[in-house]
Amino acid sequence: MGYCGTGAGMEKVTRGLEATVSRGPDDCRIIDLKDGVLGFQRLSIMGLTPEGMQPFELNGNYLVCNGEIYGFEKIKSELISKGYTFKSGSDCEVLLPMYKEYGTDMFAKLDAEFACIIYDSAAHEFIAARDPIGIRPLYYGYDAEGEIIFASEPKNLVGLCDKILPFPPGHYWKDGKFICYRNISEPERTCH
């Protein structure tokens, strides 16, 4: 869950996450950033050590992700050859180094099902993204102050946002806009 603003975000994220404790019963972490708040409830599947707990951090940037990154071992090896180090066996830990290398172009490079939120500390901005098919859920809404809030389930946003909307698959949100990075209704190749 991510609150992209400075008005009582910690309280809002805490309240929102309480609605889905059963979804991530293994651990919960909320971090208060300069420009907002990120919260994560953990269901330990991969990277079962404490180091696999999110939000992940790299050079002041943070990430929460509900996802499965296919072939992450190959991506991880490529990133290690570029000097990156990893603390856990979690597949999602490769995402922040990918963001550092490729920026938002990383989303089109992924073979994955995911819903993620990145905090870029240098730009003081949040970026949210969802896989092209929309396998992993992601919703958003705006609070009374007009700040956007993202969550994996609509019930995380009930009472925080007047209107709750599904995040469009194959898009990322940055600078207040949704940007399509992959439209599966327009295939790049066809078979004959």
Predicted region positions:
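Cysteine-centered catalytic environments shared across enzyme families
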Residues: M1-H192
